[in-house]
Amino acid sequence: MLTRPAQNALLKSMQPLFRFRGCLLAKSTSTPRRDISTSSRKLAHPTTVPIPPSVDDHALVALLDQPSSFGIVSRLFQTQGGLFGHKELQQPSGFITLAEATLVRAQILTNRILRARESQDELRKVVKNLDRLSDMLCGVIDLAELVRNAHPDRAWVEAANQAYETLCEFMNVLNTDVGLYDVLKAVLSDPTIVQGMGPEEYSTAQIFWHDFEKSAINLPPEQRQRFVSLSSEILVLGREFLQEANTARPPASIHASELAGLKDKGMGARLQLQAQFTQKDLLVYPGSLQAQMIMRCAPAEEPRRKLYIAANSSTPSQIELLERLLRTRAELARLVGKESFAHMTLSDKMAKSPENVQYFLDALMDYTRPYARKALRTLSMRKQAHLQTPPFPTIQPWDRDFYCPPEPPAPPIPLPPLTLGTVFAGLSRLFYHLYGISLRPAECAPGEVWHPHVHKLEVVDEDAGVIGWIYADLFARRGKPSGAAHYTVRCSRRTDDDDEAEDGSIPAAEPYVRVSQSFESSKRHRVRGQDGEFQLPLVVLVCEFARPSVSSGPTVLDWHEVMTLFHEMGHAMHSMIGRTEYQNVSGTRCATDFVELPSILMEHFLSSPTVLSLFDVSSSTPSSAWQVGNHHQDPCHSIDTHSQILLAAMDQIYHSPSVVDPSFSSTSALEALHKSRGLIPYVPGTSFQTQFGHLFGYGATYYSYLFDRAIASRVWSQVFHANPLNRELGDKYKREVLKFGGGRDPWKMISHLLDSPWLENGNADAMKEVGQWRIEDEVGQPGRH
């Protein structure tokens, strides 16, 4: 797949919404790693006794919780030895040199592929060489993506941007190279070659084929040029749409009398004093702290109504911008012979078609609606009691937070303060119980990291040794992007059968080739128990936690931050365990509607007291400082889920054939959807769709998160819930799902994991079946009264 890495990199950079030196083989620790005996792996009863923390677990706590561990690396940061251990990246200009070298070597390999029809032997190597070509480019593009987002030095950021743009431009040229397409067509048309392919190789070939087809490669030159033009226009419109989606909406004008009786005695009292002093209406901006407080605490409906309407307003130009984006996508799909953008996008996803997505959403909506109606009835009774109205008044959108105020997420049981090091140690212990994999601190070489507070962790398999690396850039700093992200800087692939000698050579190009080869070869290692030599995965986890200090002590995480770490480490483990022979199907390089399953499933483990015991809660912290458990039922959880289903349905409508109708209106379509399927009334004059940025990043695939939540809930309840530390169950999940990355049909993985053969076809009935599974992920939802 030549397009997906670049596209993913671009989307990550646009979304506000997841890769070294050190020991290459497992070192013996001062005390043996704890062992799970054969008998304990085969426990029939539903409790596996947690194994005590290891030396490495204690080292994780010391590394991440002690302020002293942050001073010793500054020397390593200042002495330049090469970013990620690459001697080519000792200074920013090295990025430009590396990009140029990669271009030269990529062109040489491209020429080899174009000559492949000269011999049957070369045709058999086409898929391997296309994967090499993709990895050659993505290895630099993905690294540049991280650097331009996370590096604090502007010179490095600018160099990374230049390298990124240069290589993405070349990749776009390859995606429309008719010669490459014809060679791959010759390969897939030869039964003897196809029959000799393994499952991974065939999956990789199909990915390349679909990507070429999506690039209009088989169209006449004039239409191909139109495809390129439309694709560029979509990128421009998408950037503009995201900018407008994040533009502040106009303020609501609120009279002081409308704030009478505010339950908030802090900010609310100050607002009332301000209004009395100025003798003017208050101008409150949607999304501000004042607006959030009013939506939660204002007894009168009117100020909440005004703020809701202001928050969901749009200008005519903002609506037209979105509709231009939708129409342009529709034209692109029609150009390649697809009925709609959704049909084009979903052809290689688990859902396969918009019709199947609708089957899933309809089934999920039918299952969820009774629970949501019951929750709304509860809120209606609260409104009735508050306003002394006749029975069951209508709940309006602006009533939601007042009658069901949000709370921060909370653990299921009381816990002492969880430090960053303790949570990482708990993660390591969990991975060891499930997979025989643990995390171990590793030293950084001079110049290896981009900031002195970045730490490197080895990912160690009890049998195979080191299988990859995680760089943890965990602490907030000025200029660092907000939020959490998982960057795959280097994917796995087999390298001993690259056959580089047959690429050919050009004397003038030799210096460039050596630079590119040196960059690649530093990541190649043999793994115990696995045939061949492999490029091991390298991922970076970026967060913005507070830094430990002598005065304030170690970093203590809020519960939502613990959830974030578990989610992102689910992605990281997918990358580490999914070490395939082809980089295009390794780890998280899988279908959009499957990729979130491992990360969402990780959040479910936080609902288990057995798993929480791995945080080693036997501390001397006074119970008054403990995080309080969330014991109450959330009446609004089902309303949240129903609202998400409506958003996914809206996404499908906006990418359906109806968008090409001259009379199409995104606002009218949203209103019609609410009237036919909604439970809370649509408010005339509102147009939330212009703020829904996921319409660009996840166009026609917004259902994916709901879909993976449903599957993760099923996997948790049927596989792990009763015994979440059981090694046999972890091995089954690892064997049936994680190890394949994207190299196997996800439906086959899920059907085998759940022992449900009827799911394997992934047809409309399978989509309906998943839609009927209860989404049991309250652990990932804010608690509410």
UniProtKB/Swiss-Prot annotation:
InterPro entries (alphabetical): M3A_MIP (IPR033851), Neurolysin/TOP_dom2 (IPR024077), Pept_M3A_M3B (IPR045090), Pept_M3A_M3B_dom (IPR001567)
Annotated keywords: Hydrolase, Metal-binding, Metalloprotease, Mitochondrion, Protease, Transit peptide, Zinc
GO cellular component: mitochondrial matrix
Cofactor annotation comment: Binds 1 zinc ion.
Catalytic residue positions: 568
EC number(s) from the headed UniProt entry: 3.4.24.59
Keyword Translocase belongs to the record: no
EC top class named in words: hydrolase
GO molecular function, one term: metalloendopeptidase activity
Annotated organelle transit peptide span: 1-43
Keyword hit for Zinc: yes
GO biological process, one term: peptide metabolic process
Principal place of residence: mitochondrion
Role according to the record: Cleaves proteins, imported into the mitochondrion, to their mature size. While most mitochondrial precursor proteins are processed to the mature form in one step by mitochondrial processing peptidase (MPP), the sequential cleavage by MIP of an octapeptide after initial processing by MPP is a required step for a subgroup of nuclear-encoded precursor proteins destined for the matrix or the inner membrane.
Name of this protein: Mitochondrial intermediate peptidase
Gene responsible for this protein: OCT1
